[in-house]
């Protein structure tokens, strides 16, 4: 992530961390062999933003002393009792789909699967990983062990883009979705993605979502199968979430710039005011967030995974310690607002 000009992102990031620190949540980190993660854990613990839990990596024993020196709770995934619980969960979830006991033990020792087992059991409130493991790895473990939230059929992701002011005097915080998971969403999936993004925006940013379903067309200015897809998604979305402020199809400028929105979609309550941008494909979303990050020097916080039963966030593999801290704060807010079980800080122990 390229840093935004300090005044652009500092207010939102400071508020994000302060809100998380008000009710610290237990967040587990399975990638402690990476120095960036250990650095982030130190800051998170020192500033009491979250209550970190560190997983030892059996494949990197040379890092264990450094992990234990962090002064936070440390868990060894190879300890018999803890491993057995994770293996039982894996077999319960996947045995009918061909997972053997031997393979379940192998997965159970893996820090990522072990950490998500802790999330599923309620031992911790959320998991942050992805600066070492791929998005596919992170999602596989999360779907196997945590699973989707009740009634959710589409797991997706969002970035929170903090940009310089362009509609007033204050920095903008925009939700970009989906930028990391669903490659070619159907109309139903686009509607699910929009609902998940709107729900998380309320939890994380604390304002009311105004959702623009993006296209190369604005309310009939263009035609084609991709435009039809977005229009169908809007119809489905309005039926599923009738109180949500949503419109589409809208072009990017019509969604964001009041003067353009008034000209291209004069009857829209969303045009020119959107704060949630739903892209029609992973190509569009991923390209857009990277361009805005690099050219506009926006802060890109995420990707934040949406739609899981409990929070599990996926970092960029280029994440800095600050990125990890910010995603951990968002993960904690997801857990707090979703009503995850309260935990008291556990002290400095190892299991």
Describe the predicted segments one by one.
Residues 2-271, 276-351:
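Anion-binding alpha/beta catalytic cores of soluble intermediary-metabolism enzymes, centered on
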């Amino acid at each position: 992530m390229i840093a935004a000009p300090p005044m652009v992102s500092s207010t939102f990031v400071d508020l994000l961390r302060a809100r998380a620190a008000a009710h610290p949540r237990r967040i587990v980190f399975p990638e402690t062999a990476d120095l960036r993660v250990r650095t982030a854990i130190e800051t998170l613990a020192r500033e009491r933003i979250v209550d970190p839990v560190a997983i030892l990596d059996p494949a990197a024993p040379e890092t264990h002393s450094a992990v234990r020196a962090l002064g936070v709770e440390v868990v060894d995934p190879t300890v018999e009792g803890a491993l057995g619980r994770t293996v039982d969960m894996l077999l319960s979830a996947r045995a009918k789909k061909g997972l053997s006991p031997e393979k379940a033990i192998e997965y159970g020792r893996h820090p990522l699967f072990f950490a998500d087992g802790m999330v599923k059991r309620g031992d911790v409130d959320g998991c942050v990983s992805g600066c070492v493991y791929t998005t596919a790895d992170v999602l596989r473990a999360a779907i196997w062990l945590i699973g989707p939230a009740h009634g959710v059929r589409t797991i997706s992701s969002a970035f929170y883009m903090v940009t310089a002011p362009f509609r007033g005097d204050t920095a903008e915080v925009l939700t970009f979705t989906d930028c990391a998971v669903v490659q070619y969403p159907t109309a139903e999936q686009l509607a699910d993605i929009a609902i998940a993004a709107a729900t998380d925006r309320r939890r994380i940013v604390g304002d009311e979502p105004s959702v623009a379903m993006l296209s190369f067309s604005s309310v009939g200015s263009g035609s084609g199968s991709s435009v039809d897809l977005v229009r169908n998604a809007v119809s489905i979305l309005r039926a599923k979430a009738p109180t949500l402020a949503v419109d589409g199809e809208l072009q990017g400028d019509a969604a964001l710039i009041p003067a353009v929105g008034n000209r291209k979609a004069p009857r829209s309550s969303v045009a020119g005011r959107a704060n949630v941008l739903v892209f029609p494909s992973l190509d569009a979303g991923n390209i857009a967030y990277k361009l805005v990050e690099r050219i506009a020097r926006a802060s890109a916080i995420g990707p934040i995974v949406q739609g899981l039963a409990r929070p599990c966030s996926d970092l960029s593999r280029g994440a800095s310690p600050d990125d990890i801290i910010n995603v951990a704060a968002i993960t904690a807010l997801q857990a707090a607002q979703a009503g995850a079980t309260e935990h008291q800080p556990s002290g400095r122990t190892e299991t």
